[in-house]
Amino acid sequence: MPAALHRRSWVPAASEDHVLAIAADAAARDAAGVAAEVERLVADSHRIHDVDGLNLNPATNVMNPAAEALLSRGLGSRPSLGYPGDKYEMGLEAIERIEVVAAELAAEVFGARFAEVRVSSGALSNLYVFMATCQPGDTIIAPPPAIGGHVTHHAAGAAGLYGLKTVPAPVDADGYSVDVVALAKLAREVKPKLITIGGSLNLFPHPVPAIREVADSVGAKVLFDAAHLSGMVAGKAWPQPLEDGAHAITMSTYKSLGGPAGGLIVSNDAALMERIDAIAYPGLTANSDAGRTAALARGLLDWKVHGTAYAAAMRDTAQALARALDALGLPVFAKARGFTQSHQFALEAARWGGGQRAAKQLARGGLLACGIGLPIAPVDGDINGLRLGVPEIVRLGFTPEDMPQLAGWIARALAGDAPAVAAEVRERRTRLNGLRYIVR
């Protein structure tokens, strides 16, 4: 039978050709064939990520197997509307306790008084805060893509879809953050309701106390987007945003935090969290995935017990890899500042034709990464940086002592020796044994 999906004129032609070919293949199979194909694809993904490759993408991680197992225990299809102790549906005595345990662990780990665990993604976490602090038509100030500002803070993402006007924050290129002096001037001019900080690449601590002073001067709130920094914050290897003045922290729970896919909001501001609570229920979340909440609770327990050691290991390993790449002559961004103080850093990617081209070359060598924007000269037709991170490989057992070898693989793969590198990476994976920094 022909595919039910039709061509979408607004999608790039090459992507849509690929989509329709997959759809046609699925439509041509009987039920058993589709089931077999899904199983094959799941196994293939496992091979790519867990057998043949090493993930240097800081936007991903591996979960504690005990947490991951909770995703398939039948909780996810049980709707859970309302407050614990007064649920709309019956039979939720256990699930409501799981919700409270997850929130309590989040509050403990992030030094917060309040936690919203029902959010299904980091992007929606941002939207909840936008809605709780702003009205459509209001102005916000957010980091631009040149310093890792995320699309959800801008016109094409949640902020724009909610009707907010985003003004890019002025850039401190050397610090890969915002220029606070220029920010104060801009805030006086545009009168934002919200100032956001944090993004898809974070190298050095952001000046949150100074940003809070700017926000207070114009009556704005401060949102710290810890989508990528969540593990560093949880492990106390990074300044604590709530202590420094942020009104709320949003995050994804599956990146450096190493939990299930989803979002999380923490705050010490009761009035703000009251509004966010109403947005979550009965507003936009309604039924949440209780299986994800259980997995999140189990994952947060890892941070309560091992977080300090894990975050420090990520920082030390990222710094060691950056130094090793620099020693091989690769252009590591922010060399004058010591490359990074977090779990991630970037290469200037012009010599390889851009960050995405470089990432594709690395992937041929079994090393998975992606491009990122940097406040340097642009690259025609591509992103000008290549983002690298270590959360997953540290959890797999890699240490700073392993980084010269990994740097050599990266350099060789980028120089065209990807097939040989892929074989060496695959062999190294066979010698990995279990995960570190987890509660078993």
Curated annotation (Swiss-Prot):
It comes from Variovorax paradoxus. Keywords: Lyase, Pyridoxal phosphate. This is Alpha-methylserine aldolase. Its EC number is 4.1.2.-. Its cofactor is pyridoxal 5'-phosphate. The modification N6-(pyridoxal phosphate)lysine is found at residue 255. GO terms for cellular component: cytoplasm. Optimum pH is 7.4-8.0 with alpha-methyl-L-serine as substrate. Optimum temperature is 50 degrees Celsius with alpha-methyl-L-serine as substrate. Catalyzes the reversible interconversion of alpha-methyl-L-serine to L-alanine and formaldehyde. Can also catalyze the synthesis of alpha-ethyl-L-serine from L-2-aminobutyric acid and formaldehyde. Also shows low alanine racemase activity. Cannot use alpha-methyl-D-serine, L-serine, D-serine, (S)-2-amino-1-propanol, (R)-2-amino-1-propanol, (S)-alpha-hydroxymethyltyrosine, (R)-alpha-hydroxymethyltyrosine, alpha-iso-butyl-DL-serine, alpha-iso-propyl-DL-serine or alpha-benzyl-DL-serine. Cannot use D-alanine instead of L-alanine as the substrate for alpha-methyl-L-serine synthesis.
